């Protein structure tokens, strides 16, 4: 997609796009005509800033060999004349974790969704890709028991052994989910149990989830299926560090 001027770009956005979010590097929109997401690097539109913020098409094409359904990598590049100013990617179903109430989560479904990601974690790791910044870029689609990772353009390539890279990428997505399930809600439960706290800080996600659920179930004297079943354990005084935008 090539735009001849900023005016043409702005007209396209106003006529065909819906605002989704903005971050430190750009603004994300839903493009109705293509049913895709586009991200525009706002700094790339400014001549004086561009020299410090230059992307090239090759920066995005390198992800194409890592075909998967979890990490939504750039598909097509967006140009302003000959300058790369953004990209398009597939639209993820579901809702961002930071917009999702953790009490509503069925833990069995989330476990299944995480297990589904493991093959894709292996795929990107075998392609040398190191992930980054997952807590606010993870989307959960409960109906399909599926996780998606968005805003992937800033991922790097690593010379790390693929098994070590897999462990790192696996840990990143697991830590993101642990934070979502605990922070600002069940901090007291986790911090008061040394075994559980160690799993929260250093353990793999599936082991943590199993023990977390077991301990919550013991506290409330019934099986915890959704975290709402353990809502009596919520620490109402602790707002946590994970910023949530809940309705």
Regions found by a protein language model. Name each.
Residues 100-141:
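Conserved kinase catalytic-core helix
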Residues 141-247:
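C-lobe/activation-segment region of protein kinase-like
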Residues 45, 96, 157-159:
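Conserved protein kinase catalytic core
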Residues 36, 70, 87, 148-151, ...:
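Protein kinase-like catalytic core scaffold
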Residues 13-77, 100-103:
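ATP-binding glycine-rich loop module of kinase domains
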Residues 48-61, 111-119, 166-174:
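Well-ordered, non-membrane alpha-helical segments in soluble/globular domains
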Residues 1-17:
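A short, low-complexity linker immediately N-terminal to eukaryotic Hanks-type protein kinase catalytic domains
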Residues 69-114:
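Conserved structural core of kinase catalytic domains
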